[in-house]
Amino acid sequence: MITYEERVIKELEQWKATFMKDSSMMTRFSKKVQTKVQQLIPAKVQKVLTETIRMMVQTISAGSNFIKPKLKETNWSLQRRDDEVRKKMDEYKKIAAAEGAGTGAGGILLGLADFPLLLGIKIKFLFDAATLYGFDTSDKEERLFILHVFQLAFSSDDHRKEIWKAIETWDTEKENHMDWEKFQTEYRDYIDLAKMLQLVPIIGAPVGAYANYQLLQRLGEVTMNCYRMRLLNKD
């Protein structure tokens, strides 16, 4: 009978093979449509979104109230940590879905407000997950790792491969800086067509709830696998 850790190693191999594949032709076509839609968004709105992401990155890098007290239970098994993170992920997915439905119902003005709100929810989840896996988020290097995990979840094919290399070797070749312009560009461009449709009155509510739920699901899977890999590499 295989151990939990051995099972996770196999899951990681399968996940990596799937996750690192280039996007499908349909996905690339959707991105082209999305780019056209983004061009219709006023420059002032684009500036607000860019500034929100920049400030978030700077706040996290410098230290912020996102930081959680270090977990006292240091002897948790990987299985226990995974279970606790899954519970936390379910909590945040529900919060994100409810928030997306609420802002989506309000049309363009409230829909635009969803971008910084969802960004905050994602970052809070990442800090909680890092703490549950036993990492100290008061350490600047760990906060930079969090930003790398975020980028991995919401980046283009080429940038995703570049970020994965940094994450794989993090504990031996730590990065000490963050290109926030690349960060915000990749994140903004990743946000799919559904998030743009959230700005449309009436259909915005169900679209917003679904999109936010799926984006948190993706972030949760990426986060779990990045921290699983780090813990297993230490053993």
PLM region spans:
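Terminal, membrane-proximal amphipathic helices
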Residues: 1-99, 127-235
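Transmembrane alpha-helix interface/packing and boundary motifs in multi-pass membrane proteins
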Residues: 99-112
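Conserved mixed alpha/beta catalytic, RNA-binding, or beta-rich assembly cores of soluble enzyme
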Residues: 118-123, 129
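Hydrophobic alpha-helical membrane segments of integral membrane proteins
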Residues: 111-119
